[in-house]
Amino acid sequence: FVQSALSQCLGRVDRRIIGGCGLEAPFAWDGALGWDGLRGWDAPYGCGLAAPAIDFSPTSGGALPVSSASAIAPVGLAVASENVYEGILAAAGELPFVGTVGVEGILPTAGAGAVHHSCGNGLNEMASRDAAFVPRFADAYGIGLGAYGLEVPVLGAPALGYRAGWKGCGCGL
């Protein structure tokens, strides 16, 4: 049995900007200066290593904790089972995530079947951004200039899951 999940950190917003709006991540680690996530080099963006594992609780058996940090966006995450998976998934931020459900096979002639998919309080949106070959957009893949177009050089090696730089997404210098 193998479990894995990949994710990509595009940076966190400075809590001083959005703190009064109630948009702070409830599971973020508060650093000495109140930043979300582990602090990079005096930057309000963390690398996400302090995020707690998300607990998927199946109806029988133990929990399926998943915790991940990666510089490469996932192409898919699949769970296949003949059982019912229930539980709560808490996610904060803008994630490259699309959920789909497929029902295959022979269904019982008696009983009921249901597929329920929701996104918490309904405050969600589909966001699509092109990673054009412009320095300010290329940094999400560990190359180019600083995050959010700050025009500061960064270091990146996506295959190694390492990202550093001033105001970047890494556990910077």
Curated annotation (Swiss-Prot):
<dbReference type="GO" id="GO:0042600">
    <property type="term" value="C:egg chorion"/>
</dbReference>
<dbReference type="Pfam" id="PF01723">
    <property type="entry name" value="Chorion_1"/>
</dbReference>
<comment type="function">
    <text>This protein is one of many from the eggshell of the gypsy moth.</text>
</comment>
<feature type="signal peptide">
    <location>
        <begin position="1"/>
        <end position="7"/>
    </location>
</feature>
<comment type="similarity">
    <text>Belongs to the chorion protein family.</text>
</comment>
<keyword id="KW-0677">Repeat</keyword>
<dbReference type="GO" id="GO:0005213">
    <property type="term" value="F:structural constituent of egg chorion"/>
</dbReference>
<dbReference type="GO" id="GO:0007304">
    <property type="term" value="P:chorion-containing eggshell formation"/>
</dbReference>
<dbReference type="InterPro" id="IPR002635">
    <property type="entry name" value="Chorion"/>
</dbReference>
<protein>
    <recommendedName>
        <fullName>Chorion class B protein Ld32</fullName>
    </recommendedName>
</protein>
<keyword id="KW-0732">Signal</keyword>
